[in-house]
Amino acid sequence: MKRVFSKHKIGAFTLIELLVVIAIIAILAGLLLPALAKAKAKAQKIACTNNLKQVGLSFRIFANDNGDAFPMKVSTNQGGSSEYVPATANTTVPFNFYHLYVMSNELSTPKVIYCPSDNYQTPINSTLSHTYGTNWIHILNPGSGVGLRNHGSSYIVGYNAQDTFPMMVLSGDRNITNNATGGQGPPTLVNAPTQKDGISANLGTNQTATIGAGFTKDTHQSSGNIALGDGSVQQFTTARLREQLRNSGDDQNTVGIGD
């Protein structure tokens, strides 16, 4: 008795069908990836805002314990950092991080002085140390081989900020610039020295078409988060920042920007 075997053709993609599938996947990826990137950027901006709120609160707590003065107005002998405020703008500030370091008790962890959108600075990694004090040493001490100094902080410091002037710039994203044409990369500053040790800069109040405060395109897409003298944190575009500076009560608005 003969057995009859039926032959079934196994289905497979033709080359054209395969190319169509690949094209569809590419189109879907092209649609989804920008949306995912936008969602990631938004999440990073929110995280940065929360970090700056902690920084602003720490400044306020420090001031409450030091006669309503922020660290920049308190001597190092009294636990502040006034000796590290430059006498004039457009000078290097290799110890700009110190204004934040002296608030280590208030900040609790150095992770809050890093913006997740900052591609030019180095965050403190939890694998470096699990102890509170040692993590801060990684910021302070270059002799340890991992000292980050200014590279451990994403945020500027407003040297003249006062508790009694709530509109003054206290801290904020380091992609700030006093050059209205600031583009990609680290801040472009007017009359900036060549050293890569950070810079102090006058943001001013009278903005012009060629010289004026603003934000570079990095970090938060031509915008930035700013902590004000009252401890609040707001998101600013270049236009809003300039308006804020005009109403700050400070004619210089000098800030220190880490390298």
Label each PLM-derived region with a short phrase.
Residues 9, 18, 42:
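Exposed loop/turn and edge beta-strand positions of beta-sandwich/beta-sheet ligand-binding modules
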Residues 1-15:
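N-terminal leader/signal peptides at the extreme start of proteins
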Residues 30, 42, 50-53:
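Active-site helix adjacent to the Tyr-X3-Lys
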Residues 49-259:
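Short, well-structured segments within or immediately adjacent to enzyme catalytic domains
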Residues 37-46:
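Beta-strand-loop-alpha-helix segment that lines the small-molecule cofactor/substrate pocket
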Residues 25, 44, 220:
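Generic anion/oxyanion-binding catalytic loop in active/binding sites
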Residues 19-38:
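Alpha-helical hydrophobic helix detector
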